[in-house]
Amino acid sequence: MAETEALSKLREDFRMQNKSVFILGASGETGRVLLKEILEQGLFSKVTLIGRRKLTFDEEAYKNVNQEVVDFEKLDDYASAFQGHDVGFCCLGTTRGKAGAEGFVRVDRDYVLKSAELAKAGGCKHFNLLSSKGADKSSKFLYLQVKGEVEAKVEELKFDRYSVFRPGVLLCDRQESRPGEWLVRKFFGSLPESWASGHSVPVVTVVRAMLNNVVRPRDKQMELLENKAIHDLGKAHGSLKP
């Protein structure tokens, strides 16, 4: 096999497969950018958003996006929303500050895991999980512990392909006001790129890494992409290593 493969050809080959995709968490910053990039690249024949409320879009490009409104507290009642998708992207997440400790665990672990279970039962072959740098189920920090726990639990479901993305601090213009995160982003933005890139990453780079990864054939059932790999893959243009 050639050392690299043309990205344009990989994308075209992928489009020819007429695959369908769902996105969990499309109302959040990463999910929103992911949806935009998916539509711009035209990789999937059907795009479905699964969320607790219907989102409104003004742009013509969004007119064919399907939406499934679910109650995450009663996901078993909405199993049909997870049926018939080849690929799934999970960008669900909240913060302890916003939802409290119990609410954070419920969203970032319980909702994610239940959604993955229903997706697997519904025929999803490739599940993509947005996690976090430092995720570790043995961590003493709740945030990293929960992220590590859900990574491991989803792996046990044995998707045909399971991709975990562990970005550092996400650099973006977040829709909701979080002064602490804003200060962190300003801090990383002022640092030399070589240092900042080891601990942070623009949301658009994460999203492009996800999509560049999904189009390249892989033999591994489970793959873990840390922050550096996300940078490398997200910035790839002409070719990709298989």
Curated annotation (Swiss-Prot):
Positions annotated to bind NADPH: 27-30, 52-53, 92-93, 143, 147, 170, 178
Pfam hit, one: NAD_binding_10
Keyword Disulfide bond: yes
InterPro entries tied to this protein: NAD(P)-bd_dom (IPR016040), NAD(P)-bd_dom_sf (IPR036291)
Gene Ontology biological-process annotations: angiogenesis; apoptotic process; cell differentiation; import into nucleus; positive regulation of programmed cell death; positive regulation of transcription by RNA polymerase II
GO CC terms of this entry: cytoplasm; cytosol; nuclear envelope
Gene Ontology MF term list: oxidoreductase activity; protein serine/threonine kinase activity
Chain positions with N-acetylalanine modification: 2
Keyword field contains tRNA-binding: no
Active site per database record: 143 (proton acceptor), 147
Compartment annotation: Cytoplasm
Region of interest (Required for interaction with elongation factor EEF1A1), residue spans: 2-25
Keywords: Acetylation, Cytoplasm, Disulfide bond, NADP, Translation regulation, Tumor suppressor
Function, as annotated: Represses translation by preventing reactivation of elongation factor eEF1A. May also inhibit nuclear import by competing with nuclear import substrates for binding to a subset of nuclear transport receptors. Has additionally been proposed to act as a redox sensor involved in cellular oxidative stress surveillance.
Assembly notes: Monomer. Forms homodimers during oxidative stress. Interacts (via N-terminus) with elongation factor EEF1A1 (via middle-region); the interaction is direct and competes with EEF1A1 binding to guanyl-nucleotide exchange factor EEF1B2, thereby inhibiting GDP for GTP exchange and reactivation of EEF1A1. Interacts with nuclear transport receptors XPO4, IPO5/RANBP5, IPO7, IPO9 and KPNB1 as well as GCN1L1/GCN1 and LRPPRC probably through their HEAT repeats. Binds NCOA5/CIA.
Record's protein name: Protein HTATIP2
Organism, scientific name: Gorilla gorilla gorilla
Gene: HTATIP2
